[in-house]
C-alpha cells in the first residue's frame, strides 16, 4: 500500500524538525508504522498472503533498526516518537 500524499504530509508534519525534513529517523519510523498498521489489517483479512507477511516482517525489522539508531543518537526524540506512536520500548 502506498500512503496518499495528504497522509504522508500529515504524518511528516508531526515528526519533522523543519519543513524540509523528510528523511530523519523519526519521520521514517512514523511512515513505516503506518504501513505496518495497514499490512496488519490486510493480513487479518487475507491470512494466506505470504508475500505480504514477508513484507510486514521486513518493515518491522527496518523500523526496529531505525528505532535502535534513534535511541543511540537522540534519546529524547526516541522517547517522544515511541510515546506518540504507542510503541513498546
From Swiss-Prot:
**What this chain does, per the record?**
One of the primary rRNA binding proteins, it binds directly to 16S rRNA where it helps nucleate assembly of the platform of the 30S subunit by binding and bridging several RNA helices of the 16S rRNA. Forms an intersubunit bridge (bridge B4) with the 23S rRNA of the 50S subunit in the ribosome.
- Give the GO terms filed under biological process for this record: translation
Query: Which HAMAP family does the UniProt record give?
Result: Ribosomal_uS15_B (MF_01343_B)
Q: What does UniProt list as this organism's lineage? A: Bacteria, Pseudomonadati, Elusimicrobiota, Elusimicrobia, Elusimicrobiales
Q: Which SMART domains does this entry report, sorted A to Z?
A: Ribosomal_S15
Protein's UniProt keywords contain RNA-binding: yes
Instruction: Report quaternary structure and partners.
Output: Part of the 30S ribosomal subunit. Forms a bridge to the 50S subunit in the 70S ribosome, contacting the 23S rRNA.
Q: What is this protein called?
A: Small ribosomal subunit protein uS15
Q: What keyword terms does UniProt attach to this protein?
A: Ribonucleoprotein, Ribosomal protein, RNA-binding, rRNA-binding
Any GO CC annotation of this UniProt entry? cytosolic small ribosomal subunit
